[in-house]
Curated annotation (Swiss-Prot):
It comes from the Eukaryota. It is found in: Nucleus. Keywords: DNA-binding, Metal-binding, Nucleus, Repeat, Repressor, Transcription, Transcription regulation, Zinc, Zinc-finger. It comes from Homo sapiens. This is Zinc finger protein 606. The keyword Nucleus applies. CDD domains: KRAB_A-box (cd07765).
Amino acid sequence: MAAINPWASWGALTDQSWGMTAVDPWASWALCPQYPAWHVEGSLEEGRRATGLPAAQVQEPVTFKDVAVDFTQEEWGQLDLVQRTLYRDVMLETYGHLLSVGNQIAKPEVISLLEQGEEPWSVEQACPQRTCPEWVRNLESKALIPAQSIFEEEQSHGMKLERYIWDDPWFSRLEVLGCKDQLEMYHMNQSTAMRQMVFMQKQVLSQRSSEFCGLGAEFSQNLNFVPSQRVSQIEHFYKPDTHAQSWRCDSAIMYADKVTCENNDYDKTVYQSIQPIYPARIQTGDNLFKCTDAVKSFNHIIHFGDHKGIHTGEKLYEYKECHQIFNQSPSFNEHPRLHVGENQYNYKEYENIFYFSSFMEHQKIGTVEKAYKYNEWEKVFGYDSFLTQHTSTYTAEKPYDYNECGTSFIWSSYLIQHKKTHTGEKPYECDKCGKVFRNRSALTKHERTHTGIKPYECNKCGKAFSWNSHLIVHKRIHTGEKPYVCNECGKSFNWNSHLIGHQRTHTGEKPFECTECGKSFSWSSHLIAHMRMHTGEKPFKCDECEKAFRDYSALSKHERTHSGAKPYKCTECGKSFSWSSHLIAHQRTHTGEKPYNCQECGKAFRERSALTKHEIIHSGIKPYECNKCGKSCSQMAHLVRHQRTHTGEKPYECNKCGKSFSQSCHLVAHRRIHTGEKPYKCNQCERSFNCSSHLIAHRRTHTGEKPYRCNECGKAFNESSSLIVHLRNHTGEKPYKCNHCEKAFCKNSSLIIHQRMHSGEKRFICSECGKAFSGHSALLQHQRNHSEEKLN
């Protein structure tokens, strides 16, 4: 049966943790995280006796007035929309539960108003004189709640209780209403009840202390944090029995902010938060807390509260050191790792620091029969399992084997996670995008991509990161540390994953295979980028020109074309580059290194991309075909250049003379005409050229090499362009036509000379007689006449 307890209704308005299945006010109180949770067998009945509450009270009929929560107009105005909606839902649901259990009651006017969507405060009884008799009756009729009080130090069974601080909603209500007289009377009544409760609590705990503290599974211990809204701050100082093997600490049944434990043999300070998890309920499998939004049940009110925070967006956990807040305890529990070194478990005798062990576990070291010592480092462990795992880190022992693939692990938790890679199990799902993960930590990291949270900040440059591992690697930029060294070539890396990827260049391993075309890759990121070629996906867009890219690195490189940034500078000549790969390739021009060799002909190249393009020549594959003329090309860039012959596009323009070119290399060579630069020099005759292709063709005049042969007549040429022009003699093709007389030519140079006849231009002038000619060949013929005249 759902909750009909007034405390649950009020708790819903403060914590949004409603839905408890309890009728007994003591049971509800025990479940609520703001109050002590007596989950020792029989402690509820003892609690009733200690406070004078009759055990038979739970059998009396419950009226609507017993469970209703009222607000004044002033208080109602202080509630926001979410709180008002929650109040309306709780009141209507509570009234429905009363009817469902057979209570024959008339419908209260407040329920009628809430059902019609009207304000409830209009039906509340007026309180003009601020006497608040309704609240006094509620206080007298309900279970007594400890008020906010501070007690002097008391001694009992080796424990000293210094102070209690409790949150009390009824106390707050009286304080808001200004009921001073009722407040003073309330304090007097509560002080008596508190003394009875403290006495009863110590009696119970003196008998049960060893049971609680001996069960390590009953508590979830974390470092120096408390839920900011749910948990009251309670500060205890305990001194245990020196000869006892278990610690007597009554914090076992409540939340603790700071606990200081002292022992004559050891001195240790522990910052911990202890959360009761109700073992009896876990054993029976009962899920007492049900969420109406997701139809999900929980056996722990803390887990239920975490889950409700997902729906509401409420962030209930605050870390005291940095005041960062979280809506789930797992994320909250991981956060203290950022503050490593601040809250540590320090055991002075052995000077060991414990991050994962609680002081309750470590105290076992004090007894000889329970101490496990690792001789190598003189480190001591409270459990032999910890010793076994610790020893494995030095012996390289991996005792946890997986039979499917033969992989071994040091920790059993690693084995459990690894098994999920075989089963495909991904139980942790992102609420934002639906992406699933194998472990909770991966989900937590992923969620930061949605929230934008970057909690890990570099103390050197202030740069922030979403993941702690990224911060650790980033810090190596400042320190210059590269701890991962390749055993083959001695190259160092600051990422272990980079070393693993680098080692594949030595082994030739390519474990990542494309399911579409079968192509393999050394890096998973390369496979992911390759897969986008098949899908056409380009998720990375430039903000300047809206151009899209398959991977982020390509976008980063492209953005430098807008900014003009060239961060990579050559130390030899000072030349700068936008891309690091271009700098690496450029540096090989200084060293002469050509590490990429063709296995077919042995030709070497400075860049892998140049080798890949060259290898296509041997394969004969020409996958890129022109849709205009059907011509095939081995490279996409060649096809693009070829298509410009059809479109007439010449995108590369000279800023000196305005002449345009279809290829960028032609523009570069043309600019050297203006500058007079001829960087390509022949070693045989010292002749220089402004284009490398001209030098290559010239060298063949010395060697006599003519690699381009005509299949029709067998004539050979030293340039491919000369062969193309020659082939037109066999085919009769004359692609170059004059716009004036429609005359056609097989060579472009012949068309240019012909067009000068129409324009009258004669740019070639004889140096002997000054006569001008339209073509260079005509000038050469004329100059031969002068030579013959001189001979005669």
